[in-house]
């Protein structure tokens, strides 16, 4: 397929999850409706991952595409109908007998994802070493956490040009080269093993507390394997604490098998969140999630959340923007050359600020223009003018004077306060 056809096929999937309720805003949101180029709901401004949208198939396609043309193709399966790669995530179901007074019932726990290891006991140990609120048990807080991290750490628009907004043919080509490069140089999947199992296949030198390393025996020396096994200590590359004997550890092949992590320590070095499904990116001796690895390589537009492959873009408020996406967060009007106000790190045009965000003057009860001086005390504000910031009793101007605040009113003296009480 040539680049022109790829550009024509691009779309943001606006029908997906339409009308789904927001789990964060509840009844304040009318239902999910994807903004035409931002990756948020038009109604409540929350992301799709904050809404009750069933995304399992879509997420499996996204991760499947990420692993396509990599050494991790064993983790995907191509659908016979359309050849789309699907992520074969490992689902683990544990059954535990529960003793009751008269009979024994079975308690079943389903993990929406588990490390793909043959030893289920090892997988169970791994799960138990994660914080309870991050264990991906179906229907739990942990499953919702995993869903959010899949969306946050591995955005589809960081790997698939068809998920981006109006890329040029040149930008599509550059993005494809970028994705190919990070797949070959940085992408990896963690491996869960017992540290002692790695002695045979990994390097002889392993980390021990204090930063020291064990050394291989001198030539001709007799090796006492049992003594070596007992004396070898392993420490976590992240927290530097020792690993307990018999506890599972995570290895990252790109980091080398002389590094290992506690399950709860296998996190992104920027956001410090668990690396979802142990999918990592390795750069400069650090672990990254997909999002923050890409951020370390390319500027990201604060408007559409996509990586910027254009030669021309703008910088404002310590953020990067596509030229066409430096817009008012409320009405989408272009802000180049216009007055704007930052509200929660989002630029808002002056009319929208006055209409939706401006504080109201306690004196005249009108919105306070962002360019006008004001007086603020606690949660109350006034125009800094002789018409508004006045004693609530005698109307004396209080600019530059001492005053007594009482529930939104201000007084110039105790006498005036008593007269109004």
Curated annotation (Swiss-Prot):
Q: Which UniProt keywords apply?
A: Cell junction, Cytoplasm, LIM domain, Metal-binding, Repeat, Zinc
Ranges for domain PET come to 92-199
Record domain LIM zinc-binding: where: 234-297, 299-359, 362-421
Q: Name one GO cellular component term.
A: focal adhesion
Source domain of life is: Eukaryota
GO MF entries: zinc ion binding
Q: Which CDD domains match?
A: LIM1_Testin, LIM2_Testin, LIM3_Testin, PET_testin
Question: Any idea where this protein resides?
Answer: Cytoplasm; Cell junction, Focal adhesion
From the UniProt entry, list the residue stretches annotated as the region Disordered: 133-164
Q: Name one GO biological process term.
A: negative regulation of cell population proliferation
Q: Where is the composition biased (Basic and acidic residues)?
A: 155-164
Q: What is known of its domains?
A: The N-terminal and the C-terminal halves of the protein can associate with each other, thereby hindering interactions with ZYX.
* Quaternary state and interactors: Interacts via LIM domain 1 with ZYX. Interacts (via LIM domain 3) with ENAH and VASP. Interacts with ALKBH4, talin, actin, alpha-actinin, GRIP1 and PXN. Interacts (via LIM domain 2) with ACTL7A (via N-terminus). Heterodimer with ACTL7A; the heterodimer interacts with ENAH to form a heterotrimer.
Matching PANTHER family: LIM DOMAIN-CONTAINING PROTEIN (PTHR24211), TESTIN (PTHR24211:SF1)
The similarity comment for this entry is: Belongs to the prickle / espinas / testin family.
Q: Write out the function statement from the record.
A: Scaffold protein that may play a role in cell adhesion, cell spreading and in the reorganization of the actin cytoskeleton. Plays a role in the regulation of cell proliferation. May act as a tumor suppressor.
Please identify the protein, giving its name as recorded.
Answer: Testin
